[in-house]
């Protein structure tokens, strides 16, 4: 289970979302599987489907784990392609006629299909018996339909994250 936090009109500090209203929140179901090419999980394929009341997407990726650890720690580098249905594409990047009038942005309707290619680096390390620290850097290059939406500022998205994982 996951939660899509939606988008609030006030999320943009420079007013780029003014007139678009809030994009709805929703719950999602996430199904994921990985296939290892060897016993050490050095090279793997990853498939993920995310679906919910705000739309669906699928991700297909491949990655490599670095280091000699066999406890889930260390570094991974992966590349992935994302496709989405039109419902999710328009929730995230579309502009309805009413939103166009209110915002002054061009009406934009997207179809489903290719969303992006991404490159992801992750690092995990134990800080004690049950806690791990987690770091992630992600670069996602949008496909033409998404990149052309007036909502996007550029043709890519970059994220950096740090977190903690409790291992039972």
What are these model-predicted stretches?
Residues 1-78, 87-112, 152:
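Outer-membrane pore/translocation modules
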Residues 2-6, 50-52, 82-88, 132, ...:
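Structural signature of outer-membrane beta-barrel domains
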Residues 27, 56, 83, 115-117, ...:
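Transmembrane beta-barrel architecture of outer-membrane proteins
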Residues 38-42, 70-74, 126-130, 157, ...:
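Strand-connecting loop/turn motifs
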Residues 42-44, 74-80, 132-136, 161-163:
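Residue-level detector of the transmembrane beta-barrel scaffold of outer-membrane proteins
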Residues 62, 155-168:
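Outer-membrane beta-barrel "beta-signal"
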Residues 105-118, 124-126:
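A conserved mid-domain beta-alpha-beta active-site/ligand-binding segment of alpha/beta enzyme cores
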Residues 144-151:
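Low-complexity, intrinsically disordered Gly/Pro/Thr-rich segments
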